[in-house]
Amino acid sequence: MTTIPKIESFASDLTAIRQDFHAHPELGFEEVRTSGIVAAQLRAYGVDEVHEGIGGTGVVGLINGQGGGNRRVGLRADMDALPIEETSGVAYASTNPGRMHACGHDGHTTMLLGAARYLAETRDFDGTVVLIFQPAEEGLGGARRMIAEGL
């Protein structure tokens, strides 16, 4: 498997973030802690613009490439958990009773944070990357609400 050394250099940070998200799952439109961490990480990575509260608890970041240009591409991840009791027994199991990241959204959010960090540090592209961290994907209309609020 081919890997990117720059991403390998912060892979352990991403693992810690994912395990933290997994241990603290939040249901749709309740992703206050998660969205706060996402926004703080984006700012720490040097993302050009960070907008919070889009669609309730959604976060949108913009990274401008070094090549300029008007083209845009959107990358999206969902942040919400499911109303399920976790019984996995892993060290980073849910600490919120009746809530679990059983659908991988903790991983999706972390992967997009990893992409954000890499893109913000390298900026080896033209145009703008729009990072969309969506709340309430599990049937609650988080995407519709983000669009209605200007995404």
Place the predicted regions along the sequence by residue.
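Membrane-interface loop-to-helix entry segments
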Residues: 103-105
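Acidic/histidine-rich catalytic neighborhood of metal-dependent amide-processing enzymes
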Residues: 107-151
